[in-house]
């Protein structure tokens, strides 16, 4: 088992039975609520996520998030213009960010805006809208409208789930809508997600795998998922 996942092929090989037999048994176990099936694997972790506070998220997989944040810095160019979404991993990126040259940063996050405003070579543009306590960021039609006159090189987002069938998801529809608007305002979308997000699903759908360009994650990502994501044309950067 790797990162909470076990592959159907591995079980079949260990037990000396066919993959079809294992898949049948997994369907029975899933119906009993013992596990959850994904493409080619199974997990004891419930795949559906709920909206929790950014403070709670920040305490989860903190070491992996810091490593992801350091790797994400290498994509920043001098005099760049970027969008930073809300979320604990993107906040970790903002904390680590030390750009060369003047950088324009657009964000819906009050926390990230405050962090970026402390840097002399960063100009911050904060979106307006309804403030959500869990994320300490704004969402809604005013935030979406504020992106119509923006053109950036990259958008950095977190997510609550990455699944082959459902794509990139988050906990709420409101967050998904704003993320879609941010994607339209950027040339590239970079997903910052620790490996615990793979095989999970949120209620709000951001997009399919082919809608994003780069995923930065840690080495806990299951090999089967990594291969299929790369087959979809997504670049994956793995950090230790």
Regions found by a protein language model. Give the residues of each.
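HTH-adjacent hinge/linker in prokaryotic transcriptional regulators
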Residues: 1-88, 94-106, 110, 117-122
């Amino acid at each position: 088992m790797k990162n909470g996942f076990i592959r159907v092929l591995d079980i079949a090989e260990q037990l000396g039975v066919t993959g079809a037999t294992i898949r049948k048994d997994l369907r029975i176990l899933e119906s009993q609520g013992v596990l959850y099936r994904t493409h080619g694997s199974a997990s004891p972790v419930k795949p559906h996520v709920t909206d929790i506070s950014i403070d709670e998220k920040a305490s989860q997989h903190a070491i992996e998030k810091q490593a992801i944040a350091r790797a994400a810095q290498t994509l920043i160019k001098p005099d760049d213009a970027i969008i930073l979404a809300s979320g604990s991993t993107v906040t970790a990126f903002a904390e680590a960010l030390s750009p060369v040259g003047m950088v324009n940063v657009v964000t819906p996050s009050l926390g990230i805006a405050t962090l970026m405003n402390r840097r002399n070579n960063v100009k911050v543009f904060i979106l307006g809208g309804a403030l959500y306590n869990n994320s300490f960021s704004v969402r809604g039609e005013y935030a979406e409208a504020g992106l119509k006159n923006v053109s950036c090189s990259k958008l950095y987002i977190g997510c609550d789930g990455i699944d082959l069938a459902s794509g990139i998801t988050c906990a709420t529809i409101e967050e998904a809508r704003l993320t879609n608007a941010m994607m339209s305002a950027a040339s590239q979308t970079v997903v910052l997600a620790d490996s615990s997000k793979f095989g999970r699903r949120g209620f709000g759908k951001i997009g399919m795998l082919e809608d994003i360009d780069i995923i930065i994650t840690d080495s806990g990502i299951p090999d089967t998922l990594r291969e299929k994501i790369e087959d979809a044309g997504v670049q994956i950067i793995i950090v230790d």
